[in-house]
A protein has these predicted regions:
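Secreted/periplasmic proteins that engage bacterial cell-wall peptidoglycan
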Residues: 1-77, 82
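Aromatic- and glycine-rich peptidoglycan recognition patches
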Residues: 5-13, 81-137
């Protein structure tokens, strides 16, 4: 079951949620995920494979082996605005961004040579539309 925040458009240029990490926007706004630890998150459908079936306002994230990784960099969570063949428009925030507000951003599909590492894992998953999955519990 996807978790959706229908008022996602209203988040643009609002002050960052919580401490400004990407997961804080999910934990603060998305019903059903508010306040829950990321350890409760599981990977649902791949966003790019599902395409337009992913509703506006759906919470998404990068996952490793079906779980949200607890690492300092290379993982990301956001809220979908629109899925297109070339990428995903999202509302998001991230810890090292100097802007004090939630932003609209396009996460694209990188060129084929830059999509995956030799072990099959996603290269730079935070900026690779292929690496995002719908958040489920």
């Amino acid at each position: 079951m996807p978790y959706v925040y229908p008022e996602v458009d209203e988040l643009r240029n609002k002050p960052v949620a919580g401490s400004g990490t990407c997961v804080d926007i999910i934990k603060e706004y998305v019903p059903g995920l508010k306040g829950l630890p990321t350890t409760s998150w599981k990977a649902g459908v791949n966003v790019m494979e599902a395409g337009a079936k992913v509703a506006k306002g759906t919470a998404i994230a990068t996952f490793v082996n079906g779980r949200y990784p607890r690492i300092n960099t290379g993982n990301h969570a956001a809220i979908v605005i629109k899925v297109m063949p070339s990428g995903i428009w999202v509302m998001d925030q991230w810890a090292n961004d100097k802007r004090p507000t939630i932003q609209l951003r396009l996460i694209t599909i990188p060129p084929r040579a830059l999509q995956r590492n030799s072990d099959g894992s996603f290269r730079n998953p935070s900026n690779n539309a292929l690496a995002f999955y719908v958040i489920e519990k």
